[in-house]
């Protein structure tokens, strides 16, 4: 069994890389979870129950991080000593800043016109852009271009926020 301090990848005996076989992650998660689930320790002493709970919590957190591609990228960068710093590093390339403004303007226009179809189309375009950017992110991470990968992660985080905003607007207009 791994240690509580091992990386999420080590916990599930997976290679430390962005490209991940999600079905292998799911299988490894079920295996580890079956070993550490607190129900297995119902008759154990308090100390063993507490340790089992720590393992179960650690396993769930690791799974959630590795299962989500954006969280996995941030985590992988943190293992490499790179802090994405999304909270205080908002500098982005000018072309992406222009794209942000266009997306925001399109959201405002479609929302003001109560045009759910336009919002749906924008969301589809955004998801397509997200797929392209995740492919680029994978290449950056695999090549060790950590600073460029960090920038790509910040951009993807912004895209996720815009997608969530569109979802909120669609929901608001549907009600």
From Swiss-Prot:
GO terms for biological process: [2Fe-2S] cluster assembly; protein complex oligomerization; protein folding. Residues 7-79 form the J domain. GO terms for molecular function: ATPase activator activity; protein-folding chaperone binding. GO terms for cellular component: iron-sulfur cluster transfer complex. It holds the Pfam family HSCB_C. Keywords: Chaperone. InterPro entries: DnaJ_domain, HscB, HscB_C_sf, HscB_oligo_C, J_dom_sf. Interacts with HscA and stimulates its ATPase activity. Co-chaperone involved in the maturation of iron-sulfur cluster-containing proteins. Seems to help targeting proteins to be folded toward HscA. Belongs to the HscB family. This is Co-chaperone protein HscB homolog. It comes from Paraburkholderia phymatum (strain DSM 17167 / CIP 108236 / LMG 21445 / STM815).
């Amino acid at each position: 069994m791994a240690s509580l301090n091992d990386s999420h990848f080590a916990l599930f005996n997976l290679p430390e890389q962005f490209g991940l076989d999600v079905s292998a992650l799911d299988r490894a998660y079920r295996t580890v979870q079956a070993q550490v689930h607190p129900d297995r320790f119902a008759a154990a002493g308090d100390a063993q129950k507490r340790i089992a709970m720590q393992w179960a919590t650690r396993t769930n957190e690791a799974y959630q991080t590795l299962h989500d591609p954006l969280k996995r990228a941030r985590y992988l960068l943190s293992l490499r000593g790179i802090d994405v710093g999304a909270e205080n590093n908002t500098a982005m390339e000018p072309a992406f800043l222009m794209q942000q403004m266009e997306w925001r303007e399109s959201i405002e226009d479609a929302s003001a016109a109560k045009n759910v179809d336009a919002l749906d189309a924008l969301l589809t375009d955004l998801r397509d852009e997200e797929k392209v950017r995740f492919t680029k992110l994978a290449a950056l991470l695999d090549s060790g271009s950590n600073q460029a990968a960090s920038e790509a992660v910040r951009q993807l985080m912004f895209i996720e926020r815009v997608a969530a905003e569109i979802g909120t607007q669609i929901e608001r207009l549907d009600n």
